[in-house]
């Protein structure tokens, strides 16, 4: 009995399958595409949408822009539309919109430039703003650092400092019942720094006198406003920058001892103006002068540390310079010998810091040499005679005595390098110099450099000297 024939499978319908319908009658979501396939959706109105976007930008009036709610129709408090009213003088109701507008802020220049030496027509004094012809003689170019004055410095008479809820400081003037954000101590400090006939430029004189002598060909001068500038007579130019702060000059000049700091003359007591500087003005001047001296002392200490680091960096390069052909006097001097001993004692070598100096015994191999090359193996010509080792690169006899006379002095200056140089004299020195110099050239033979011969099949079978992993 023959088995019943199965009907052939029906081919899949061409085109996209119709979406399945849920029992509720709504079309279900289309099935997810199989892995590796992408579904591309084509929209017929894409060009129309892009054109509408361009029209909205090019013609904003004709575009359908949604109407915004006017400000009056929004739920805003009444104080949003009314300016604040000036209140009485108190901490709770302090504002700068009241009578405090009489004190206009003044920008004090911190760094000068040749094009901005003239100040404006008005200047800030202790009693307020003075403008007009009377302010012209008192208009000076002030140098002032942009740092906050510490809280321990006392305020002028009639002033009080308070803080807002956010922690910002403001100042209360009980004399005229005003508040301000500006620190009145800065104005007082700027008045003390104004150069007058009695005390011309005390901080600048202190800074310049403690910096050491000027380089050759330089001269220091001062303008009518008390600004210090420098004249270079070599190329006939002027500069606002101090040439002593140039790192090239600091490297060339060896500072053996710090320059003595000249104490400034005592400031003449100034008469208080407007009742702000009261009877405690002399104490305030002394405190401000003490702060300036402390700042100058800290600046000099940092500068001295920087110069000391530069000096150590230069001296650390002396051994390499001496080996390349430097002079003997700079190394064999007693002062430099003591400094080299100090530097090597402070180095990171455990043998040099242990106290008992490490001394090398006399060596019979080629471990000690005048050359900087290292030999991984004993040369083949080491046991041959001197005549057979003539490679044509012998060291000239004129340079050997200078090396023999220079290196013992330098090696004796370093602790822990008690080297016996007896084996480096005469023929042994010549043998070692001839032997070590061409050792690097022997290692790089022509067979290594010839890539084609190494990669050739016959070369790999017969004369291969490489180990392939």
Swiss-Prot record:
PTM statement from Swiss-Prot or TrEMBL: Phosphorylated by LATS1 and LATS2; leading to cytoplasmic translocation and inactivation. Phosphorylated by ABL1; leading to YAP1 stabilization, enhanced interaction with TP73 and recruitment onto proapoptotic genes; in response to DNA damage. Phosphorylation at Ser-366 and Ser-369 by CK1 is triggered by previous phosphorylation at Ser-363 by LATS proteins and leads to YAP1 ubiquitination by SCF(beta-TRCP) E3 ubiquitin ligase and subsequent degradation. Lactylation by AARS1 promotes nuclear localization and stabilization of YAP1, leading to increased Hippo signaling pathway. Delactylated by SIRT1.
Family matches, as Pfam families: TEADIR3, WW
InterPro entries for this protein: TEADIR3_omega_loop (IPR053819), WW_dom (IPR001202), WW_dom_sf (IPR036020), YAP1 (IPR051583)
Residue ranges with Pro residues bias: 1-21
Entry GO MF terms: chromatin binding; DNA-binding transcription factor binding; proline-rich region binding; RNA polymerase II cis-regulatory region sequence-specific DNA binding; transcription cis-regulatory region binding; transcription coactivator activity; transcription coregulator activity; transcription corepressor activity
GO BP terms in the entry: blastocyst development; bud elongation involved in lung branching; canonical Wnt signaling pathway; cardiac muscle tissue regeneration; cell morphogenesis; cell population proliferation; cellular response to gamma radiation; cellular response to retinoic acid
Modified residues (N6-lactoyllysine): 75
Positions of the UniProt region annotated as Transactivation domain: 273-469
Phosphotyrosine sites (modified residues): 373
Domain annotation WW: ranges: 153-186, 212-245
Keywords from the named record: Activator, Cell junction, Cell membrane, Coiled coil, Cytoplasm, Membrane, Nucleus, Phosphoprotein, Proto-oncogene, Repeat, Repressor, Tight junction, Transcription, Transcription regulation, Ubl conjugation
Modified positions (Phosphoserine) in chain numbering: 46, 90, 94, 112-113, 116, 146, 271, 320, 333, 347-348, 354, 363, 366, 369
Domain note: The first coiled-coil region mediates most of the interaction with TEAD transcription factors.
PANTHER family (UniProt xref): TRANSCRIPTIONAL COACTIVATOR YAP1 (PTHR17616:SF9), YES-ASSOCIATED PROTEIN YAP1 FAMILY MEMBER (PTHR17616)
The protein's role, per its UniProt record: Transcriptional regulator with dual roles as a coactivator and corepressor. Critical downstream regulatory target in the Hippo signaling pathway, crucial for organ size control and tumor suppression by restricting proliferation and promoting apoptosis. The Hippo signaling pathway core involves a kinase cascade featuring STK3/MST2 and STK4/MST1, along with its regulatory partner SAV1, which phosphorylates and activates LATS1/2 in complex with their regulatory protein, MOB1. This activation leads to the phosphorylation and inactivation of the YAP1 oncoprotein and WWTR1/TAZ.
Subunit structure comment from the entry: Part of a complex when phosphorylated that contains DSG3, PKP1, YAP1 and YWHAG; the complex is required for localization of DSG3 and YAP1 to the cell membrane in keratinocytes. Binds to the SH3 domain of the YES kinase. Binds to WBP1 and WBP2. Binds, in vitro, through the WW1 domain, to neural isoforms of ENAH that contain the PPSY motif. The phosphorylated form interacts with YWHAB. Interacts (via WW domains) with LATS1 (via PPxY motif 2). Interacts with LATS2. Interacts (via WW domain 1) with ERBB4 (via PPxY motif 2). Interacts with TEAD1, TEAD2, TEAD3 and TEAD4. Interacts with TP73.
Protein name, entry field: Transcriptional coactivator YAP1
Organism: Rattus norvegicus (Rat)
């Amino acid at each position: 009995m023959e088995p019943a024939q199965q009907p052939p499978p029906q081919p899949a319908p061409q085109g996209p399958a119709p979406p399945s319908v849920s029992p509720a009658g709504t079309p279900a979501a289309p099935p997810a595409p199989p892995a590796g396939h992408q579904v591309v959706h084509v929209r017929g109105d894409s060009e129309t949408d892009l054109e509408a976007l361009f029209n909205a930008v090019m013609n904003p009036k004709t575009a359908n822009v949604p109407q915004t709610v006017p400000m009056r129709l929004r739920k805003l408090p009444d104080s949003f539309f009314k300016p604040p009213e000036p209140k009485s003088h108190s901490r709770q109701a302090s504002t700068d919109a009241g009578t405090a507008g009489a004190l206009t802020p003044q920008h004090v220049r911190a760094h000068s430039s040749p094009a901005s030496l003239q100040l404006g027509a008005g200047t800030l004094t202790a009693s307020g703003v003075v403008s007009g012809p009377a302010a012209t003689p008192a208009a000076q170019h002030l140098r002032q650092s942009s740092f906050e004055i510490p809280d321990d410095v006392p305020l002028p008479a009639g002033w009080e400092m308070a803080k807002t809820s956010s922690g910002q400081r403001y100042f209360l003037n009980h004399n005229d019942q005003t508040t301000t954000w500006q620190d009145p101590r800065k104005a007082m400090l700027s008045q003390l720094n104004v150069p007058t006939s009695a005390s011309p430029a005390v901080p600048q004189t202190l800074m310049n006198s403690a910096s050491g002598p000027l380089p050759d060909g330089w001269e220091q001068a001062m303008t009518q406003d008390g600004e210090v500038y420098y004249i270079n007579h070599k190329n006939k130019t002027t500069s606002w920058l101090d040439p002593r702060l140039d790192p090239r000059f600091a490297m060339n000049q060896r500072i053996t001892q710090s320059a003595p700091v000249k104490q400034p003359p005592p400031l003449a007591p100034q008469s208080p103006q407007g009742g702000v500087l009261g009877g405690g003005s002399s104490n305030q001047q002394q405190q401000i002068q003490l702060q300036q001296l402390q700042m100058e002392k800290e600046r000099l200490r940092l500068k001295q540390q920087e110069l000391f680091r530069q000096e150590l960096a230069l001296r650390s390069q002396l051994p390499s310079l001496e080996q390349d052909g430097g002079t003997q006097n700079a190394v064999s001097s007693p002062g430099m010998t003591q400094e080299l001993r100090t530097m090597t004692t402070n180095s990171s070598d455990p043998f040099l810091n242990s106290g008992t100096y490490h001394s090398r015994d006399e060596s019979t191999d080629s471990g000690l040499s005048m050359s900087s090359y290292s030999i991984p193996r004993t040369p083949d010509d080491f046991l041959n005679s001197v005549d057979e080792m003539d490679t044509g690169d012998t060291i000239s006899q004129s340079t050997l005595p200078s090396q023999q006379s220079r290196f013992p002095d330098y090696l004796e200056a370093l602790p822990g390098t008690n080297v016996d140089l007896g084996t480096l004299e005469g023929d042994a020195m010549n043998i070692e110099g001839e032997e070590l110099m061409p050792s690097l050239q022997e290692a790089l033979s022509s067979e290594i450099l010839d890539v084609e011969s190494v990669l050739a099949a016959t070369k790999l079978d017969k004369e291969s000297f490489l180990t392939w992993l």
